[in-house]
Amino acid sequence: MKFIDQTIIQVIAGNGGNGCVNFRREKYIPKGGPDGGDGGDGGNVWLQSDNNLNTLIDLRFKKTFQAPHGENGSGKNCSGKKGSDIKIYVPVGTKIINYQTREIIGDLIKHKQKILIAKGGWHGLGNTRFKSSINRTPRQRTLGSVGEKRDIQLELILIADVGTLGMPNAGKSTLVKSISGAKTKIANYPFTTLNPVLGSVNTEGKKFIIADIPGIMQNASQGFGLGVRFLKHLERCKILLHIVDLCPTDHSNPVENIRIILNELKKYNTSLYNKPRWLILNKIDLIKSSEIKKIIDKIKNFLKVEERFYLISSIKKIGVKKLCSDIAFYLQK
């Protein structure tokens, strides 16, 4: 199924039903009093999260959702039927934004969490409501009010404990697949991963969710490549794993690749840049130990600060168990 993480829909709540003007007319009761009933309230529109959904694709094709109107009141003090509510189901992690005002209406981060996004109109009052000691035959009534109408932007942000980032073909997908069994495509060319993928990792009785997003390239913040569009899916993560290829097939400089990623991350969002970030130096099986030491020295000199880093080989699972164990321990703190 195609991964869609953003869409705009229109929601229209039902109008309230009108109140009724009516008088009791029965045999032997020629001057019966008012008996006009109230209208019914308009139907509401709700959004509800569902763990079984992982894309907004269904809402890309149906753009307008309208709840039924409340029915008008009638004689014999009969109230109109309330318009039934409607629910729109979305994936867990969906952020709800008022498209016009940019106000954040809500954020559905739990299963079966729901939020009212368009309130139905209030019912109109029948003439019975206006009877008094000085007005025995009221002809007043009120009309039902109009239901709310809104344009809503829905933005899906995946919920994961750990997120991966790095250049295309750095080995992010291989790592995620090797530790979680996630069904992510792997090949020896850039941008193999076209959409975010979630994997569940179990280690030493502890469990965490890891997200794999498409690789980031230079000038991604200006629209190049794929990754910057999906960086938002790292916003809920507690740790970021910055995967670095120590032996790039394009012969690029690993230190320069680190600089590119950090620069693009900072330009995208400073709060994301400031998240806890571990440096994962990958593909150590393809390079000599002496070369690894030289690269590490250059990285430390570039970063200027002490940053936690790991030496691993995703494909041969060297150092991976220790990494997973440390992640699980960190998340429990």
UniProtKB/Swiss-Prot annotation:
This protein's cofactor list reads: Mg(2+)
- Broadest EC class? hydrolase
Keywords (alphabetical) are: Cytoplasm, GTP-binding, Hydrolase, Magnesium, Metal-binding, Nucleotide-binding
Which residue ranges does the record assign to the OBG-type G domain? 160-332
Binding-site positions, Mg(2+): 173, 193
User: GO biological process: any one?
Assistant: ribosome biogenesis
Q: Name one GO molecular function term.
A: magnesium ion binding
The superkingdom listed in its UniProt entry is Bacteria
> Where does this polypeptide localize?
Cytoplasm
One protein family per Pfam:
MMR_HSR1
**Does the keyword Nucleotide-binding feature in the UniProt annotation?**
yes
Residues the entry annotates as binding GTP? 166-173, 191-195, 212-215, 282-285, 313-315
The record's GO CC annotations read: cytoplasm
| E.C. designation(s) | 3.6.5.-
Which CDD domains did the record assign? Obg
The Obg domain, residue ranges: 1-159
Provide the family line.
Belongs to the TRAFAC class OBG-HflX-like GTPase superfamily. OBG GTPase family.
Question: Subunit comment for this entry?
Answer: Monomer.
Q: Its function?
A: An essential GTPase which binds GTP, GDP and possibly (p)ppGpp with moderate affinity, with high nucleotide exchange rates and a fairly low GTP hydrolysis rate. Plays a role in control of the cell cycle, stress response, ribosome biogenesis and in those bacteria that undergo differentiation, in morphogenesis control.
* This protein's name: GTPase Obg
* Taxonomic source organism: Buchnera aphidicola subsp. Schizaphis graminum (strain Sg)
Taxonomic path: Bacteria, Pseudomonadati, Pseudomonadota, Gammaproteobacteria, Enterobacterales
Q: Which gene encodes it?
A: obg
